[in-house]
Amino acid sequence: MTRLSRMLSSLTPRRGKPDMSIVVVVHNIPREAPRTLFSLSRGYQRHICATDYEVIVVDNGSDPPLDRRVIEETFGPNFRLIRLDAAPPSPAHAVNRGLAEARGEIVGVMIDGARLVTPGLLHFARQGARLYDRAIVATLGWYLGHDFQRWAMTAGYDTKDEDALLSSIDWPQNGYRLFEVATLDESSVDGWLMPVTESNALFLRRELWTELGGLDERFDAPGGGLLNLDTYRRALELPDTEPVLLLGEGTFHQLHGGVATNVAVGCLAESLARWNAHYES
């Protein structure tokens, strides 16, 4: 049994615990994180009560750090912040820390806290997880903007343009209008009814996360490298699992200088070669 498995197994059920936990990792994204967290709040999410879920925000060494009081007072008592001061560059340990703290029966992981979500994500993820005893609930991934962000940036696309896009759809008044100003990302580029290569909001029952052993902390590159793809693959390879893809919901990536999503094409090719070599080793 892994250290994470022991930590998860040692947590005893608490009276009044939430049905769901969502672990969100943030690192140096002061512009994007508040939007992401608002999109997970009861003021935005539909068909779900604040007592039904908790959001565990893991600050993976941000400088300056997120303010615990601001997080909990702004977004509600079902939000809590965990701060990792001596944080490794990969988000793997941060996710595992969040998993160990999670109290819900269904646990979602958002490895990149710069992603907005649609208003029915939590409701339908909960319903999807209940379709099968061993459901793997995934979402399509999108970029804000009308091209892959690394290509759009070469034409001058920046955070001001992204802010204008969100204003043009009056976000967050109707979160489903995000689909109007977004492009499917590489994980989902084959389209609505095709398999995805990773999910930036991945929901499993608690015991499946335990069986999986959490995220593999050997993925120690900044940003995690192929960590998220590996996690999704390993989840699907667990015995007797059933994939569930939420077609009407999604996650939407904001510009923030991500090591994979917002780097020049040439730099990405170098990184992919390095990450693949690391993965094969």
What are these regions (language model features)?
Residues 7, 29-45:
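Short, well-formed alpha-helical segments that are part of the catalytic scaffolds
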Residues 85-102:
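Glycine-rich, basic loop-to-helix element that forms the pyrophosphate-binding segment
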